[in-house]
């Protein structure tokens, strides 16, 4: 049986890579526009799903990133945007 300490390794990501962010917002149009304004580069944005009550919509945003720092910066910038409720 594996122990928790056996999983204490950082995942190695090879860059450049296309990274998928799951972005959730209340207004579909504003959420898409927010993703586009934050990334400011070619981004494939696809609708993922709507919450059970219809209040939230989620999108997949596939973006080419060239480093860990760039990937983290995009994540933080998406999180800070007023029209985005959550980023995974």
Predicted segments, located by residue:
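Long, contiguous binding/interaction regions
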Residues: 1-58, 64-88
């Amino acid at each position: 049986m594996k122990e928790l300490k056996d999983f204490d390794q950082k995942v190695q990501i090879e860059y450049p890579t296309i990274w998928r962010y799951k972005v959730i917002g209340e207004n579909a149009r504003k959420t898409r526009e927010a993703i586009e304004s934050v990334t400011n580069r070619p981004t494939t944005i696809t609708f993922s799903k709507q919450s059970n009550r219809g209040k939230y919509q989620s999108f997949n945003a596939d973006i080419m990133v060239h480093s860990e720092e760039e990937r983290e910066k995009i994540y933080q910038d998406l999180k800070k945007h007023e029209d985005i409720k959550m980023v995974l």
